[in-house]
Curated annotation (Swiss-Prot):
Role this protein plays: Catalyzes the condensation of carbamoyl phosphate and aspartate to form carbamoyl aspartate and inorganic phosphate, the committed step in the de novo pyrimidine nucleotide biosynthesis pathway.
Gene: pyrB
Name of the protein this chain belongs to: Aspartate carbamoyltransferase catalytic subunit
Pathway assigned to this chain's UniProt record: Pyrimidine metabolism; UMP biosynthesis via de novo pathway; (S)-dihydroorotate from bicarbonate: step 2/3
Organism: Azobacteroides pseudotrichonymphae genomovar. CFP2
GO term, biological process aspect, one: 'de novo' pyrimidine nucleobase biosynthetic process
GO terms for cellular component: cytosol
Length: 302
């Protein structure tokens, strides 16, 4: 059987995505399974993570799998100069699947080419975060009842935000309309605009976070400005609090509007939004368990 990886959402067809959404719903209805009994899952986090790592580990535990790995690269042989190739080769001897986050773009793709063990990308630099995309799409499906013809407004860091880049690819099959709100320093890279042009996806660029745009939206996708992507602290300080969503901005929004955020947040959503029924970011994070159960079982052919 040909090895299967989950490296980029661009590797997924429309049918692949719909199948994974269906499987996510199955795992939400049937949370505790024995599907990973006798399976060892390696979680290799070369970059800090809380939500993604714990979500994957919860997904594995719910499926009765066992976990090996690390969350602090400084405690591993990588800190002694071991190459990524050698780390992957060694861990492949121990595990049935490798879930990895790395600070280098393309690291997961590279890993997938040097091992026969399935690779699941838990984020590679500013490139892709496909498991987040699947849980985002599942959250949209759950809250909207459809994936088709949604108006999606994305706010904040569109340049470095790998969740944003993956989401554009994943939703491209479903005729979305996008509104992009970002300061000049964090605008969406041209390669993604070219992708949308090539796929006849309608999108609008904005610099101002206007209530009128919120009121048109089915999904409001907030993102944080990522301090770790900036070499210049002054540049970060200039843009970190440019856009802040407060509860009063939602007064005339559509009834079906839901607010998503890949988390963590650092001030771009005020705490008074948390009790608004349109806030969905905490439920969204929980959906990650089911989406990641679906991904792991899919690459293992279970």
């Amino acid at each position: 059987m040909k090895k299967k990886d989950f490296v980029s959402i661009t590797d997924c067809s429309k049918q692949d995505i719909l199948h994974l959404i269906e499987r996510s719903a199955y795992f939400e209805r049937n949370l505790n399974q024995l599907l990973l009994k006798d399976k060892i899952c390696a979680t290799l986090f070369f970059e800090p993570s809380t939500r993604t790592r714990l979500s994957f580990e919860t997904a594995i535990n719910r499926l009765n799998g066992r976990i090996i790995g690390f969350s602090d690269v400084h405690t591993t042989s990588s800190s002694k100069g071991e190459t990524l190739k050698d780390t992957i080769k060694i861990v492949s001897n121990y595990a049935d699947v490798i879930i990895m986050r790395h600070y280098l773009e393309g690291a997961a793709r590279y890993a997938s080419k040097i091992t026969d063990v399935p690779i699941v990308n838990a984020g590679d630099g500013a490139n892709q975060h496909p498991s987040q995309t699947l849980l985002d799409i599942y959250s949209m499906y759950k809250t909207q009842g459809t994936l088709y013809n949604l108006t999606i407004t994305i706010v904040g860091d569109l340049k470095y935000g790998r969740t944003v880049h993956s989401l554009l690819n994943g939703m491209s099959y479903f005729n979305p309309t996008f509104h992009f709100i970002a300061p000049e320093e964090l605008k969406l890279p041209i390669i993604y605009k070219q992708f949308m042009d090539e796929n006849s996806i309608q999108y609008f660029d904005h610099s101002d976070f206007l209530v009128d745009i919120i009121n048109q939206s089915d999904i409001l996708y907030m993102t944080r400005v990522q301090r770790e992507r900036f070499n210049d602290l002054i540049e970060y300080e200039k843009v970190k609090n440019v856009y802040v969503l407060s509860n009063d901005m939602l007064a005339d929004s559509k009834d079906n509007l839901r607010i998503l955020h890949p988390l963590p947040r650092v001030g771009e959503i005020t705490s008074d939004v948390d009790t608004n029924p349109k806030a969905y970011y905490f439920e969204q994070a929980r959906n990650g368990i089911f989406a990641r159960q679906a991904i792991i079982c899919d690459v293992l052919g279970l």
